[in-house]
């Protein structure tokens, strides 16, 4: 019986300490105000896999299957 009382007291103490600790709150409104740090890599770049791009002499990989 003493073990049950001791376990209950320790459990309640742990719950009380956990409730007293500050929680990390996520501020959703702040996330919308942050600047966007993602970069669109397709913007402004020519399509390297396009056949016209390779025929114009702009092929940066000359041995891509032709060697």
Swiss-Prot record:
Changing residue 67 to S: Abolishes the ability of the protein to interfere with the binding of host integrin to fibrinogen and platelet aggregation. GO terms for biological process: suppression of blood coagulation in another organism; suppression of platelet aggregation in another organism. Keywords: Blood coagulation cascade inhibiting toxin, Hemostasis impairing toxin, Platelet aggregation inhibiting toxin, Secreted, Signal, Toxin. Salivary gland. A motif (Integrin-binding motif) lies at residues 64-66. Residues 1-20 form the signal peptide. The keyword Secreted applies. Residues 35-54 have a biased composition (Acidic residues). GO terms for molecular function: integrin binding; toxin activity. It is found in: Secreted. It comes from the Eukaryota. Disulfide bonds: none annotated. The keyword Metal-binding does not apply. Residues 35-67 are annotated as: Disordered. One of its GO terms (cellular component) is extracellular region. The Arg-Gly-Asp (RGD) sequence serves as an integrin-binding motif and is required for blocking host platelet aggregation. Inhibits collagen- and ADP-induced host platelet aggregation by blocking the binding of host integrin alpha-IIb/beta-3 (ITGA2B/ITGB3) to fibrinogen. Inhibits the intrinsic blood coagulation pathway in the host by blocking the activity of host coagulation factor XIIa (F12). This is Ayadualin. It comes from Lutzomyia ayacuchensis.
